């Protein structure tokens, strides 16, 4: 009630933030004359001065005005570009660890230089994160002269980079790379066999470009490093042949089936379910083909993997379509990013789904994989001490940024007012009518000499529009996942007079469309251009630029609405950069996916009430509101799925932190002898307790079992029964001490034979190997637990609570297994006198061989949707309030007497800290 009045009196929080930073801008501007007066050498020397002042105790906030003024002056001298006042505000926003929303063409890349330079002065490194390798290399090469002028080093991390190059890139003051590469390197570092093999140092400060794409769109898909598992290619091929015989159950609006079938599809959640008839039918087919035993059920425990294969094949046939969700290139399935329209080489779907699609398309089936290490972007980026981001569209997701990452969004004012006209949506009855209207609009704009950008949601629709334009005799360029190698070239000239460019979603994001085309690309195409040629190209471009401005600027046409308003806003934002004129229009039909699934009934009834005829369009605010309501509903659902993924991964993340902390402690330890001693005593105590319960009578003792267990665990044969027969006074406590003495003595004999140094090195390497093998198996067990946990909802149990409880039990078992298996291996193995360096080199060679066989997946997470479906009654209509999660600090130390972070209630030293 009072919010509008308070906002009117005091301004919005965003306005107050901008006003506060505007005062700091005045201080930076006041320093400009001083900086202009400095020679190049004096300006360069400022970096060393700032570093010394920081070392003596000045904070980065205190250095900010001078540092920003230095970067602004260096930008003028090195690149001929001066930071605008609004760009300084953007730089301060990023330094504060917030998200800066800046419109297309406002110079986000240049803005990033300000906080990156300032934070690099600390010597702890800064990571600049981009969405693809092309942008990482482009931005690094573009800004490198500026940073190097100021005495800072720049590195770029890329896939398949030689280890020494990657290490050098991470050691640089500023490191550019993609979100995937930073995440995978973090996982690889935690699989290293020595500290020298690690790449990353402390995760200090990250500036994430296109932050919405990385932290929102990519948040549902975990990063996975996997190795090959068993080969099931024949099974995929056999089941693939059976799926086309299943029929879909078609339903009316009232929910009654019009045609009996075997499965139903829920397009809202992208789930497919077999019905009772479907289960019986597929069981009969599997039995006939020898895949299921006579009279056996598909739901028997030993047939569950077969059921997984059936569902994977069913999803591949019904939910994944060629040229929409993926393309076939050679003998590979390349997934398409639904948000950018780009292919994602190397990314594979999990749970056998990728293999099922390969079988569907008749391609060679690659072996299934086993998870070796995994994390999510949500948990990886929260490891940084400070996180900031830039994007053209973040305000619609401000709630999620705040709740999940603790990041505020600040909308930065534009340098010049936006002159773009956003027309109301036009809604048609059919897609055919919609596309006809789009072609008419293109012809009209082209006649005026305006450049046109047509945004489509899939390769299929982009090729359909292309076909219609060919039939109409209109010259055009197509930019989709099939032709992505021409992306920069096509986008560069998309602003030429009368040019028509078709792009799937936001392909080309990160490259501005300049009105009149890009004269720099024309110059770059010439070999050794002269000053006269460059001047002529500039003059011709200036004419074209003016011609396009007078015609009305770039016109953006969208062929349908995306699930997210943010993606729609990104497409609109291609027009009207830096105050240029432009316009945008969305063309929709009731047959579009979003309209058909979420909004069609209300709009269809409205159109019928108006008596709409074929070919007519409706343009009304009520229709636009209905569509936006549908989008908000989808956004709310997607937010809940991401939130569910985070809540589930947070459980695994606590365990991951404990294991990785333990691993790093082992790597940095010179000697793990004390740890092995503790393991030996605890394992022995557990073994004896199993056969001689504490405070029990001798009649209850299982001496024969104890002798066998001691040989199994410690490779020592002890005549315990003989001891007891010979000594009546050998009680429980004295017996325990005697057994321990014998086991320790046997181990010391081994040490004398092998040599203390060799055994210490072997202990360390073996402990690492046991830890890695058991952690890998634990990840697989956790995957299976997570995929089936939603079924607990049917037993009136909370799946999340059950997952937390059972995963804690599994983790306790993992810790016990690490101790027991390490002692068992060390007791049984014969250690040769070998140079520890040779042993480490051998293990490193084995690790390198493993690395060659690794697959790096950024896989889908359908199980989270199932988890959501299992708790559907709990989900609110829109985004639900959640408790803000504190960023996880990379160097955080947990006190041994503090409560364990896993939530068990025990002290850390008696729980997950007992292996440190």
From Swiss-Prot:
In residue numbers, the region (Disordered) covers: 857-916
Gene Ontology BP terms? intracellular protein transmembrane transport; protein import; protein targeting; protein transport by the Sec complex
* Protein name per UniProt: Protein translocase subunit SecA
Q: How does it assemble?
A: Monomer and homodimer. Part of the essential Sec protein translocation apparatus which comprises SecA, SecYEG and auxiliary proteins SecDF-YajC and YidC.
Q: Which Pfam families match?
A: P-loop_SecA, SEC-C, SecA_DEAD, SecA_PP_bind, SecA_SW
Q: Which residues form a coiled coil?
A: none
Domain of life, per the record? Answer: Bacteria
Q: What does this protein do?
A: Part of the Sec protein translocase complex. Interacts with the SecYEG preprotein conducting channel. Has a central role in coupling the hydrolysis of ATP to the transfer of proteins into and across the cell membrane, serving both as a receptor for the preprotein-SecB complex and as an ATP-driven molecular motor driving the stepwise translocation of polypeptide chains across the membrane.
Enzyme Commission designation: 7.4.2.8
Gene Ontology MF terms: ATP binding; metal ion binding; protein-exporting ATPase activity
Name the coenzymes or cofactors required.
Zn(2+)
Protein source organism? Pseudomonas aeruginosa (strain ATCC 15692 / DSM 22644 / CIP 104116 / JCM 14847 / LMG 12228 / 1C / PRS 101 / PAO1)
Annotated keywords: ATP-binding, Cell inner membrane, Cell membrane, Cytoplasm, Membrane, Metal-binding, Nucleotide-binding, Protein transport, Translocase, Translocation, Transport, Zinc
Free-text remark on how the cofactor is bound: May bind 1 zinc ion per subunit.
Q: Which family does it belong to?
A: Belongs to the SecA family.
Class of the enzyme per the UniProt entry, highest EC level: translocase
Q: What is its main location?
A: membrane
Q: Name one GO cellular component term.
A: cell envelope Sec protein transport complex
Annotated residues for binding of Zn(2+): 900, 902, 911-912
Give me the residues that bind ATP, please: 87, 105-109, 512
CDD domains with a match to the protein in the record: DEXDc_SecA (cd17928), SF2_C_secA (cd18803)
Q: Please list the reactions this protein catalyses.
A: ATP + H2O + cellular proteinSide 1 = ADP + phosphate + cellular proteinSide 2
Compositionally biased intervals (Basic residues):
906-916
The membrane topology noted for this protein in its Swiss-Prot or TrEMBL record is: Peripheral membrane protein
Q: Where in the cell does this protein reside?
A: Cell inner membrane; Cytoplasm
